[in-house]
Design a protein with these regions (language model features):
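A residue-level marker of the well-folded mature domains of exported/periplasmic proteins
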Residues: 1-157
Length: 157
């Protein structure tokens, strides 16, 4: 996971632990970084899991490009990778000839819908400020693009 300090990922971890608890055939290993900016540490965690020869890896990448290589190596060693929340770079995966399942939102579309809703509530002369997430996070970039597209279509700035 990304940061095990972030509330979102604390809840995700707790949910996974609760789900796995009654399943005797499932040995769950939850690992994550201390912050949402520790890309190298997350890469190291991925290689550690590969070295442990786990059966499957569920990955929430901090950086959608930097985590492609460890994901590719896992798949090539027979370890399926399920990518959740922030999608790994599809172009890099394609270049590597590897498929990774993705489960998560369409961040562009979600932010576009929020922008459209806001556009209905504001006047053209109103100004909108955007407070972004991490610039390295692809989901943050997608959300920004979707939101800006919607408000620009409404003539807001």
């Amino acid at each position: 996971m990304k940061s095990l300090q972030a509330d979102f990922f604390k809840v995700m971890k707790e949910g996974a632990i609760q789900y796995a608890a009654p399943l005797p055939f499932l040995d769950l290993i939850c690992v994550g970084t201390a912050t949402q900016t520790e890309v190298k540490e997350q890469i190291d965690l991925m290689y550690s899991l590969i070295h442990q020869q786990v059966d499957v890896i569920v990955l929430v990448p901090i950086d959608s490009k930097a985590l492609v290589q460890p994901a590719v190596e896992a798949v090539r060693k027979g370890i399926p990778v399920i990518n959740i929340d922030i999608q790994l770079d599809a172009q890099l995966l394609e270049q590597a000839g590897v498929e990774v399942a993705f489960v998560g939102p369409d961040n562009f579309a979600a932010a576009y819908e929020v922008g459209k809703l806001l556009g209905k509530k504001l006047r053209n002369e109103d100004k909108v400020a955007i407070i972004e997430g991490l610039a390295v996070a692809d989901n943050a970039r997608q959300r920004k693009r979707g939101f800006i597209k919607a408000i620009e279509e409404k003539g807001l700035r």
